[in-house]
Amino acid sequence: MVKVKFKYKGEEKEVDTSKIKKVWRVGKMVSFTYDDNGKTGRGAVSEKDAPKELLDMLARAEREKK
């Protein structure tokens, strides 16, 4: 799968899209939660920097919400 690179609390992080649980939009940012070895991690990336797979997950989540 594809890795998503993002900054969280000033720290550079990277997570595999297969570990992402939930995706939603906040303005022009794409926020998500992911499985961080049993804990829930959080992250956000701008829409323009988000990989296509993450945008596809966002589109699917928005469709299911309606």
UniProtKB/Swiss-Prot annotation:
Major subcellular location class: cytoplasm
Localization: Cytoplasm
Pfam families noted in UniProt: 7kD_DNA_binding (PF02294)
Misc remark: Sac7a and Sac7b are truncated versions of the Sac7d protein, most likely resulting from post-translational processing, or degradation during isolation.
UniProt PTM comment: Lys-5 was 70% monomethylated in form 7a, 25% in form 7b, and 20% in form 7d. Lys-7 was 50% monomethylated in form 7a, 40% in form 7b, and 50% in form 7d.
GO cellular component annotations of the record: cytoplasm
Function (record text): Can constrain negative DNA supercoils. May be involved in maintaining the integrity of the genome at high temperature.
Protein name (Swiss-Prot/TrEMBL): DNA-binding protein 7d
Subunit structure: Monomer.
Manganese in keyword set: no
GO molecular function: DNA binding; RNA endonuclease activity
Temperature notes for this entry: Hyperthermostable.
Keywords: Cytoplasm, DNA-binding, Methylation
UniProt cross-references to InterPro entries, sorted A to Z: Chromo-like_dom_sf (IPR016197), DNA-bd_7a-e_arc (IPR003212)
Domain of life: Archaea
N6-methyllysine modification, residue list: 5, 7
Reported pH dependence: Highly stable from pH 0 to pH 12.
Family under the similarity heading: Belongs to the 7 kDa DNA-binding/endoribonuclease P2 family.
